[in-house]
Structures are given as structure tokens and as C-alpha cells.
Amino acid sequence: MNNTYPHPIIAREGWPYLGGIFIVTLIVHAAAGLGWAWPFWLLTVFVLQFFRDPARTVPTQANAILSPADGRIVAVEQVRDPYADRDALKISVFMNVFNVHSNRAPVDGTVQQVQYFPGKFVNADLDKASLENERNAVVLRRADGQVVTSVQVAGLIARRILCYTKVGETLARGQRYGFIRFGSRVDVYLPLTARPRVTIGEKVSATLTVLAELD
């Protein structure tokens, strides 16, 4: 996996959408003028902001668990991690359609498992979405042996999960490893000893926000 994603301002996942709507907009504008074309220009601007993908600076704290996504915290609770088969602290980030949708590694680690599960498409803001919706789990093991699980969860509108990593690869904190189109949720399962640094309702930014700290 390429560790040096070039951050071309607009996510590569959006290039086909942007190219298509831009061509249609130019055709309508040329044929009918701005009066007919302005809704298409607005749509073009929306697509631009939706697929924006700015570079992020990784915090220096070695024990920090970084947010894998932009969004809002909707859960901080002790649960069972069904992917790593353990009790864990779960922190969930809900992404709406206006958030950046790139997903980034929360820790440095080696990929132990990549598990895809088909499922429903209920509102990702609901707790039941974590285990009922379509999802993709990546289990990471840090050099110190601690395990962190990051789960991309599809939502009511988002029905396309993209994951670019595989078992055996090493991810660096903040490294881009996936994308979910049109808003959704990412669940992060941490060791029970992790100390949360966010609260429900708090807005977070991928890589920039520290979700928790490990011992």
C-alpha cells in the first residue's frame, strides 16, 4: 500500500463525479446560458466540497489514538469487540454529508484482519448500525502488542465502503486507508485501559483529534 497519498485537494474517489457534472454543467451553460446552468454550478460546488481531501498533520504523542474520520462523537462506551473477540472501549464517529469522507489509520500498526460484512443501511447515527449495517473492520496490532479495531460502517445514504489495505500491511497513524461516500460512521475499539479524550457530541477531525490515550 502506498504510504504517500499525494493529497490532490479533491479525493480521487470523486474525480469521476466531478468530471461528469462539470462536463454537463458546461454543456448546459453553453446551450442555455447561466439562467439554466446555475443549479448545475451549485451542484458542482457541492461535489467539490464533498470530495475535498486536505492533508493532515499527525500529532506527536506516541500513545495517542487519532480520530479515523471527521464528524461528531456519538458513542463512548464499554462493549464487546466482536472483531478482535475482547471487551473494549468503543468510540464512534458519525460523518454527515458535509464532512470529509477519507478514513485514516488511528494508530501505527500491522493489519491483522480485514473483515467485510454485508448488512442493512439504517441511519448510521443509531447504535444498532454498528452491528446491523454493512461494514468493514480493520484490526491493527501496535508494536507494543496492543490492538485497535477501526470499523467503517455504511449508512442510510452511504452505501459504498472503500478499503485499500490488506492483512500483513503496516499502516502509519494518519495514513489514508479508506473512504465512505456520502456520510456514515467509523467505530474504533480500544483496550479497556485506554483513557478517552472526547465526549459525546464533540466535533472531531481525522488525524488532528486525539480520541484517547493508551497506557
Swiss-Prot record:
- Single GO BP term: phosphatidylethanolamine biosynthetic process
HAMAP family, sorted:
PS_decarb_PSD_A
Which cofactor(s) are needed, names only? pyruvate
Of the GO CC terms on this record, one is: plasma membrane
Q: What domain of life?
A: Bacteria
Query: One matching Pfam family, short form?
Result: PS_Dcarbxylase
> Site Cleavage (non-hydrolytic): which residues?
G183, S184
Q: What kind of modification does the protein receive after translation?
A: Is synthesized initially as an inactive proenzyme. Formation of the active enzyme involves a self-maturation process in which the active site pyruvoyl group is generated from an internal serine residue via an autocatalytic post-translational modification. Two non-identical subunits are generated from the proenzyme in this reaction, and the pyruvate is formed at the N-terminus of the alpha chain, which is derived from the carboxyl end of the proenzyme.
Q: How does it sit in the membrane?
A: Peripheral membrane protein
Family to which the UniProt record says this protein belongs? Belongs to the phosphatidylserine decarboxylase family. PSD-A subfamily.
Cofactor binding note of this UniProt entry: Binds 1 pyruvoyl group covalently per subunit.
Q: Which residues form the signal peptide?
A: none
Q: What is this protein called?
A: Phosphatidylserine decarboxylase proenzyme
- Keyword annotations of the record: Cell membrane, Decarboxylase, Lipid biosynthesis, Lipid metabolism, Lyase, Membrane, Phospholipid biosynthesis, Phospholipid metabolism, Pyruvate, Zymogen
Q: Where in the cell is it found?
A: Cell membrane
Pyruvic acid (Ser)-modified residues are where?
S184
Provide the function of this protein: Catalyzes the formation of phosphatidylethanolamine (PtdEtn) from phosphatidylserine (PtdSer).
Complex formation: Heterodimer of a large membrane-associated beta subunit and a small pyruvoyl-containing alpha subunit.
Root EC class:
lyase
